[in-house]
UniProtKB/Swiss-Prot annotation:
Residues 337-552 are annotated as: B. SMART domains: HATPase_c. It comes from Yersinia pestis (strain Pestoides F). It comes from the Bacteria. This is Chaperone protein HtpG. It is found in: Cytoplasm. Transmembrane segments: none annotated. Homodimer. One of its GO terms (cellular component) is cytoplasm. Belongs to the heat shock protein 90 family. Molecular chaperone. Has ATPase activity. Residues 553-624 are annotated as: C. GO terms for molecular function: ATP binding; ATP hydrolysis activity; ATP-dependent protein folding chaperone; unfolded protein binding. Residues 1-336 are annotated as: A.
Length: 624
């Protein structure tokens, strides 16, 4: 082979690390290398079809796209070739020598020593071409970009260690040819029956014909036999597609090793004509929280592939959904910019969003255990829904799950429908509390009255919860009420109109005024409360005041938040409050009041501005 411009280059450090991890973590599932390479060939064919829409000459007189497999037992090689889009020298360096995915370094650092878990994570990452090194100790690539001269072919070769060789060659046929020099012990991939079996398992559903070389034993002639159905799965009728085929197609488009939790395949005719195939994965992708990474569906127009990760068809809170849409109404030359402003896109987005929410409703109704698995993986994303998608807020609310005082468990298993069904007679509101952790929410003094009255409270401890609740105002006509807010309805619950209590409060009015004078502008108000049973004091905020958790959310985002002004509420029946009320010495009185306020602030915020002063004050009072 005549090679020019030959050079040896080092792999990007992340590639070396991924190759090492992959070879060791994925060996038990090594046959997926064939799925990955055929999937890449299918993508190359899709890209050529799309580009040829505006430049038919790229087909170079050969529009019959396919991928071919052949093997040589003597040389111990397996060769896979396609006549798709091919690559230039720069593209080979970018695609085979580096990983362009954002967040790659952080992803690789997250890989540990758990081999089973690592294999799932690496599978999610999308191993693609590099999977060849699971079974090969050397890989050779010959490629030429469609429409480019024959002498612009590229040779690439590597043993999957620290470097690779690249050179310019002459290649008459467009497309890519990958030759795997198999490791010792990998003879099964030199067997015709074994190759057919793997291809049928993983690649029956793709539209690209997969052909295997057949040699005539008598005269040595070579023919090619198609061994997959080569019909786009979503174009077939649902009745003729097996669950295994749906699962295999999911793994093809999502590059996932695990089966999906659920899927929905629909063909819509009428004002708009389209086919959608949507999947709910079983586990969250490694980059779901990476803001730089695009998430979206594969877009086809009249069965022609247009683009990957078309995010315009799904709201951000459903970014975990995988699948495709095949539209008959969009133009073949559609771009991301056109999609953004298209009424057709908006209508499709609305319809697909409703389809996914219906799928989740059905899953929650039919299989609570599977839905709980979904919630553990994607619940945090779904909690973004009420703020992002007001038109579907009620449906999303039904899908939310919470921890609750009813279950005495940190597991988020309680639905709002569950809560409403258990509401006490006469109860008009859905009570909840937000805190930094489940333990802090569960032990909050704000719950004392509700435990006493046997009223269930939802325990919210995810960072997003306070923000979510600012958009969730009611459910089935029942208003949401934070138990950490100062509210008249909570006073009624506490029977604060009891004549005996009113008499006791009157006697403590001078004490309350004394506390107000001492604290001044540091608090919004000082009040007596009967919401507490075991705690001497709490702080609350007015209904229109920013809550503690919302202020923390602003701070975490680096935004300036207004200072939270608390209402200081004292329990007149508690021994410490009674003791403080009896103190006549101003200095000692100030110590008691400051201690009670610090206790209340610590319970509410989890921190104090000056914890050392709090400790000194407490020690002084303990030894007084």
């Amino acid at each position: 082979m005549n090679m020019k411009g030959q050079e040896t280059r080092g792999f990007q450090s992340e590639v070396k690390q991924l190759l090492h991890l992959m070879i060791h973590s994925l060996y038990s599932n090594k046959e997926i290398f064939l799925r990955e390479l055929i999937s890449n060939a299918s993508d190359a064919a899709d890209k050529l079809r799309f580009r040829a829409l505006s430049n038919p000459e790229l087909f170079e007189g050969d529009g019959e796209l396919r991928v071919r497999l052949s093997f040589d037992k003597e040389k111990r090689t397996l060769t896979l070739s396609d006549n798709g889009i091919g690559m230039t020298r720069d593209e080979v360096i970018d695609n085979l020598g580096t990983i362009a995915k954002s967040g790659t370094k952080a992803f690789l650092e997250s890989i540990g020593s758990d081999q089973a878990k690592d294999s799932q994570l690496i599978g999610q990452f999308g191993v693609g071409f590099y999977s060849a090194f699971i079974v090969a100790d050397k890989v050779t690539v010959r490629t030429r970009a469609a429409g480019a001269p024959a002498d612009t072919g590229v040779f690439w070769e590597s043993a999957g260690e620290g470097d690779y060789t690249i050179a310019d060659i002459t290649k008459d046929e467009r497309g890519t040819e990958i030759t795997l020099h198999l490791r010792e012990g990998e003879d099964e991939y030199l067997d015709d029956w074994r190759l057919r079996s793997v291809i049928s398992k993983y690649s029956d559903h793709i539209a690209l014909p997969v052909e295997i070389q057949v040699k005539n034993e008598e005269d040595g002639t070579v023919t090619w036999e198609k061994i997959n159905k080569a019909q786009a799965l979503w174009t077939r009728g649902k009745a003729e597609i097996s669950d295994d085929e749906y699962k295999a197609f999911y793994k093809h488009i999502a590059h996932d090793f695990t089966d999906p939790l659920s899927w929905s395949h629909n063909r819509v005719e009428g004002k708009q004509e389209y086919t959608s195939l949507l999947y709910i994965p079983a586990q969250a992708p490694w980059d779901m929280w990476n803001r730089d990474h695009k998430h979206g569906l594969k877009l086809y127009v009249q069965r022609v592939f247009i683009m990957d990760e078309a995010e315009q068809f799904m709201p951000n809170y459903l970014r975990f959904v995988r699948g495709l849409i095949d539209s008959n109404d969009l133009p073949l030359n559609v771009s991301r910019e056109i999609l953004q402003d298209s009424r057709i896109t908006q209508n499709l987005r609305s319809a697909l969003t409703k389809r996914v929410l219906q799928m989740l409703e059905k899953l929650a109704k039919d299989d609570a255990e599977k839905y709980q698995q979904f919630w553990q993986q994607f619940g945090m994303a779904l909690k973004e829904g009420p703020a992002e998608d007001g038109s579907n807020k009620e449906t999303i609310a039904k899908l939310l799950r919470f921890a609750s005082t009813h279950t005495d468990s940190s597991a988020q298993t309680v639905s709002l429908e569950d809560y409403v069904s258990r509401m006490a007679e006469g109860q008009e509101k859905i009570y909840y509390i937000t805190a930094d952790s489940y333990a802090a929410a569960k032990s909050s003094p704000h719950l004392e009255l509700f435990r006493k009255k046997g009223i269930e409270v939802l325990l919210l401890s995810d960072r997003i919860d306070e923000w979510m609740m600012s958009y969730l105002t009611e459910f089935e006509g029942k208003a949401f009420q934070s138990v950490s807010k100062a509210d008249d309805s909570l006073n009624k619950l506490a029977d604060e109109e009891n004549p005996e209590q009113q008499e006791a409060e009157k006697a403590l009015e001078p004490f309350v005024e004394r506390v107000k004078t001492l604290l001044g502008e540091r608090v919004k108000d000082v009040r007596l409360t009967h919401r507490l049973t075991d705690t001497p004091a709490i702080v609350t905020t007015d209904a229109d005041e920013m809550s503690t958790q919302m202020a923390k959310l602003f701070a975490a985002a680096g935004q300036q938040a207004p200072e939270v002004k608390y209402i200081f509420e004292l329990n007149p029946d508690h021994g410490l409050v009674k003791r403080a009320a009896e103190v006549t010495d101003d200095t000692q009185f100030a110590q008691w009041v400051e201690l009670l306020l610090d206790q209340a602030l610590l319970a509410e915020r989890g921190t104090l501005e000056d914890p050392n002063q709090f400790i000194r004050r407490m020690n002084q009072l303990l030894t007084a």
